[in-house]
Amino acid sequence: MALSLYLIAVICSLVGFTASQQTCDNDNRFCFPNVVANWIGAAEYCSRNGWRLAVLDSEQKQQQVEELAQRVDAFKTAKVELWIGASDLAREGKFMWHPTGLDVSYSKWIAGMPDNKDGYEHCVHLWYEPSRLINWHWNDVVCASMRRFVCEQA
């Protein structure tokens, strides 16, 4: 049994997952798996479960995610960071939606972002930290960092 748990932990770490894995149901367009992953791991997790990393390409979709996130008990903390499906991995400074290949046109960047700090920030996350007046804004961060994420029905 201990060996099985160890092997599961090793396999999960190889694809960038930690914590318990929960699938999303079809009751909502968006969901927040109880999984922590890097950006690639988050995209893979959503895809393997028939979803995609969230494409927030309109104010309406952004508001839907904000409203749903505010109902998640785990997010009633001082700081929440969630991966979404945008990055500039293909071309620096040109943010695209990974799941669709379309350019990011709608955005809700924090003032002064994206900034590609130190040349390593290529993936986008939603950031909620009311003490810093950050209210579900976007920020570019290092893709290898671990955080929860938002999946969307594909």
Curated annotation (Swiss-Prot):
Q: Which cysteines does the record link by disulfide bonds?
A: C46-C151, C123-C143
**What function does the entry list?**
Putative lectin. May have a regulatory role in mosquito immunity. Probably suppresses replication of dengue virus type 2 in mosquito salivary glands.
Q: Name one GO molecular function term.
A: carbohydrate binding
Keywords assigned by UniProt? Disulfide bond, Lectin, Secreted, Signal
- Check the record and name the InterPro entries matching this protein: C-type_lectin-like (IPR001304), C-type_lectin-like/link_sf (IPR016186), C-type_lectin/snaclec_domain (IPR050111), CTDL_fold (IPR016187)
Quaternary context: (Microbial infection) Interacts with non-structural protein 1 of dengue virus type 2. Interacts with envelope protein E of dengue virus type 2.
Its protein name is C-type lectin 16
After gene disruption, what is the outcome? (Microbial infection) RNAi-mediated knockdown results in increased expression of dengue virus type 2 envelope protein E in mosquito tissues at 7, 10 and 14 days post-infection via thoracic injection of the virus. Increased titers of dengue virus type 2 in salivary glands of infected mosquitoes at 7, 10 and 14 days post-infection. Increased transmission efficiency of dengue virus type 2 by mosquitoes, measured as a proportion of mosquitoes with positive infectious saliva among the total mosquitoes tested.
Write down any Gene Ontology CC term. extracellular region
